[in-house]
Amino acid sequence: MSFQHRQIEKKWQDYWEDNKTFKTDTFSNKEKFYALDMFPYPSGQGLHVGHPEGYTATDILARMKRMQGYEVMHPMGWDAFGLPAEQYAIDTGNSPAEFTNQNINTFKRQIKELGFSYDWDREINTTDPNYYKWTQWIFKKLYENDLAYMDEVAVNWCPALGTVLANEEVIDGKSERGGHPVIRKPMKQWMLKITAYADRLLEDLNELDWPDSLKEMQRNWIGRSEGAEVTFSIKGNEGTFTVFTTRPDTLFGATYAVVAPEHPLVKEITTLSQKEAVQNYLDEIQTKSDLERTDLAKDKTGVFTGAYAINPVNGEEMPIWVADYVLMSYGTGAIMAVPAHDERDYEFANTFGLPIKEVVAGGNIDDEAYTGDGEHVNSEFLNGLGKEEAITKMIDWLEANGSGEKKITYRLRDWLFARQRYWGEPIPIIHWEDGTMTAVPDEDLPLTLPQVAEIKPSGTGESPLANNTDWVNVVDPETGLKGRRETNTMPQWAGSCWYFLRYIDPNNTERLADPKALEEWLPIDIYIGGAEHAVLHLLYARFWHKFLFDIGVVSTKEPFQKLYNQGMILGEGNEKMSKSKGNVVNPDDIIDSHGADTLRLYEMFMGPLDASVAWSTNGLDGSRRFLDRVWRLYVGDDGSLTDKIIDDESTELDKIYHETVKKVTDDFEHMHFNTGISQMMVFINECYKANKIPKIYAEGFVKLLSPVAPHLSEEIWQKLGHSESISKATWPAYDESKLVEDEVEVVLQIMGKVRSKIQVPVDISKDDLEKAALDDESMQKWLEGKTIRKVIVVPGKLVNIVAN
């Protein structure tokens, strides 16, 4: 008989909600365990089967830890600001807030139907003014500590749409919507000085229990480089420019310089004869993204400015070019080109007929750039030296001659913290007519978004908020000074930088969260989510956390002690699930046909949690069959317990039961859920073979199953005679003495060749083992007509007989 999943699941979901079964006591005396999911963006599509994979993993840990006596924090909320809701509002004329709330309701229903043990009293929503009041407060603190500033930054400007576009909205230089031309245009933007934390973000990675691959991605993103900054003067011009290089030892081989098209020097140094060519080039590359500009495979383009730099080390003139492969946002926006020893410079020099001078021996520069190590040549005081020695000597020379200095630089850029959008947190800053800026006072937070009838582009590059003059224009009541509110809003990353702190104290109106509560619960014990957030979200959250640590809000340097990335669930043919391929699996359908417990079990059993695995309907059916077998083992056709479960002590399942408790506990702790479930299946097979199942083992098994299949387990637990939820029960313990084998298999050999195997007691003596080997029927056949010369006995392993 199959269990009725629809009735059982609804019954227990209602029970948990009515009884607040999973409510967390913030100041409990128990040991704390904080299990966190990456909260979702509530899209219009609803939940997909990828979401429950990570959520089930944290839920298993949360449920097990509760039963092990921990106070567990396991919350859920909504990362609800974002572009899709604004786009929907522009397209339909409806409110993004209403659209977002509808989506949240769908997500919440779906998540509740999966039976996750969330404390819904801690639910947060990043678009709730009571929440973003504190996002604004953190921004204010960053501003007060000189970590938020305004700067001119090139953005993707679409004149036809009258708006700034995010990188992901631009495809091949055109807007994703409508295919209009997009150009790069400098605009004043808010920046956060994440670079001030670069070293700490790098060093503290060593203290975290994170996957090595993920730590490496963050290290590469921060990209610490040691080298030198070199200053070049310009022939016939007062100006200078600096370049950063990791190879100052190759300065004698620098034969030309390249500056980014956006470099302020370009206008200053371009000669009259080159002005037109330079302007044409600047117009031509306006539509290219940074990614296109730095593509190694693309043909090199550039134009000569007509100006020359002076190489400080040998006084030689170097032509200054403008080329799009140099970015203003990286380094100083200018490079010294050493074409003999850099592939990109070599290609550029060959394209434009620029000189190539060897300064490191070992290659053939007529054929290609030599990027290996070797002795320095054509380098005066560096000749004959190796790389490291030459770098040190050149830096000493640069510093002694006032031409440069040792420098550490980072690939990490400051964080562009502004979006020209309506649907985001308003930035709490006022720009006054006298050119000053002030932050909105704390007592006026939250600065809420104004209600608008429709969202339309401002046409000026400002956000749609600029259209709302009543909201934008302000007057200082004390001085009469006129001002304008900041019209940019925060990026979607803002709310997710600190949401895990608010869960700890979600209704506090006086402060971000109670410091004592934060101290109780931080750092987070386990954070599970997709690897696509490896860099941005996790780096930004670490940056904000370190800042909050510095100003005394939190007491830990890092927010997430242990982090785990779940893999991706692919379509049946090993392809990514997508609507266009028609291979998307909707969890609602599975919950209806197979049940939430089956979906949870299957997603944990389909493979290792961190692997990408293809969805299989057969696998799903197999998971349901296993749960049906469990049900039939416990529950008869009349709905009562089967006769197989007895109160007596029977020993036939001793070993397999204690093995199962040990393996499931260990595997769940280490997030090897698939092998833990596999062991449960082995146990159920043994139960079917056994004559009787002691009730204590029957109960122990249901406890082990309950984190994976909670609804079914609650129902069986009730049938076993319990009135309280199984989540209040104690996690089973195993007895080491029951795991010990009382018998062992011994290999029997003649002249080193295996001829038989026997089972013997573990504590058998050497003499008895020798006798048992000689008495074995198979051995007697092999020994017939032979003389035994020697018997070698290795207790617990083998007996080898030398005979001829």
From Swiss-Prot:
Q: Which InterPro entries did the record assign?
A: aa-tRNA-synth_I_CS, aa-tRNA-synth_Ia, Leu-tRNA-ligase, Leu_tRNA-synth_edit, M/V/L/I-tRNA-synth_anticd-bd, Methionyl/Leucyl_tRNA_Synth, Rossmann-like_a/b/a_fold, tRNAsynth_Ia_anticodon-bd
Q: Which domain of life is it from?
A: Bacteria
Q: Which residues does ATP bind?
A: K579
Q: Output the Pfam families linked to this UniProt entry.
A: Anticodon_1, tRNA-synt_1, tRNA-synt_1_2, tRNA-synt_1g
Q: Where is this motif: 'HIGH' region?
A: 40-51
Q: Which GO terms describe its biological process?
A: leucyl-tRNA aminoacylation
Q: Keyword Nucleotide-binding: yes or no? A: yes
Q: What is its EC number?
A: 6.1.1.4
The record's catalysed reaction(s) read: tRNA(Leu) + L-leucine + ATP = L-leucyl-tRNA(Leu) + AMP + diphosphate
Record-level GO cellular component terms: cytosol
The molecular function terms of the Gene Ontology recorded here are:
aminoacyl-tRNA deacylase activity; ATP binding; leucine-tRNA ligase activity
| Alphabetically ordered keywords of this record | Aminoacyl-tRNA synthetase, ATP-binding, Cytoplasm, Ligase, Nucleotide-binding, Protein biosynthesis
Q: Where is this motif: 'KMSKS' region?
A: 576-580
User: Where, per UniProt, does this protein localize?
Assistant: Cytoplasm
Q: Which PANTHER family match?
A: LEUCINE--TRNA LIGASE, MITOCHONDRIAL (PTHR43740:SF2), LEUCYL-TRNA SYNTHETASE (PTHR43740)
Under HAMAP family, the record lists: Leu_tRNA_synth_B (MF_00049_B)
Q: Which family does it belong to?
A: Belongs to the class-I aminoacyl-tRNA synthetase family.
Protein name according to UniProt: Leucine--tRNA ligase
Q: Which organism is it from?
A: Oceanobacillus iheyensis (strain DSM 14371 / CIP 107618 / JCM 11309 / KCTC 3954 / HTE831)
Chain's gene name: leuS
